[in-house]
Amino acid sequence: MRGCFSTARKRLAAALAALVMASGAGLCEAWVEIPITDIAPLRIGQTEDARAGTGCTVLIAENGMAAGLDVRGGGPASRESQLMNPLMAAQTVHAVVLSGGSAYGLGAANGVMRCLEERGYGYDTGFALVPLVVQADIYDLSVGDAAVRPGPDMGYEAAVRAFDAPNYRNGNYGVGCGATVGKIAGMETSMKTGIGSFAVQIGELQVGAIVVVNALGDVYDWKTGEQIAGLLTEDLKGLRSTSEYMKRSIASVDNKFTGNTTLAVIITNARFSKTQLCKIAGMGHDGMARAIRPVHTSADGDSVFALSVGQVEADMDLVGTLGAEVIAEAIIRAVESAQSAFGHPSAADLK
């Protein structure tokens, strides 16, 4: 038994040593950045209501993909999350939906199921095809029109786009349409963020992440430690620390610890089981912790999905390590690509 552990440690040490040797200032010089859409056969479609400030992003692998999930936030809004429990029978899912609308938006998955069924995809029960669609939502009802939430029609439209006209973009699109950060003092001093992605390739291995940043806390450049988004000063011209604000307002009864969640999806072309993907998803949360402070609060629904869409052989711990880094970088992209909206300035407005 001791010899087995020794062999495993040596394999992991060799993999991580290769990663460190190739790395510069955190990001690997050996990496080649690729578009997130290069990780085939995953399809991505988005739709949003720019007037109402909400939308959804759909990731589809119509023939099925192994999926894992790790939830660290205390207030998630999710659908069919138990499908990714290693104890459950299903080994693959057909789609992942990220949506606005909080719990109201969970109906978007019905539209994705309809699209998949129409195209002949799903688990064959002998009586009907049942597409397995999992979903997690952000709370964006405090932005735009709270009466408008993603539903079956919006989910269907995003799924159709994923098949017929893939349209993934970073910024105020899809689920990122109504995303904001720095909300502890109220929406008046919060900032606009969005959805972001970052993906890399090392040899045959591809690892990427899509993140919608809708956190209670602040966002930091994980490479420099500089705060780039979050709680605004009262004159709306600069940034202040959410953590410091929390310390000063510890006895306050009107803290607004509501309406938050950061959702991330790690995508890889490496072959893993859903048990392994749950571990990779858990490691991915390290990327959130590097870039968002505070994170994983009781008011956040912070969740990381991990998806395997290929057959490349790769070390699980290496992919988990890379997953954390691509999440941290995707968070920065979500901030940098966002545009001001609904009275909330973006990072570009502070430069």
Residues covered by each model-derived region:
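Charged, low-complexity surface segments at secondary-structure and domain boundaries
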Residues: 1, 20, 142-144
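Intrinsically disordered, low-complexity segments
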Residues: 2-4, 21, 301, 346
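A detector of low-complexity, intrinsically disordered, Ser/Thr/Gly/Pro/Ala-rich segments
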Residues: 5, 19, 34-35
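Bacterial N-terminal signal peptides
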Residues: 14-24
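Alpha/propeptide regions of enzymes that mature by internal proteolysis
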Residues: 30-351
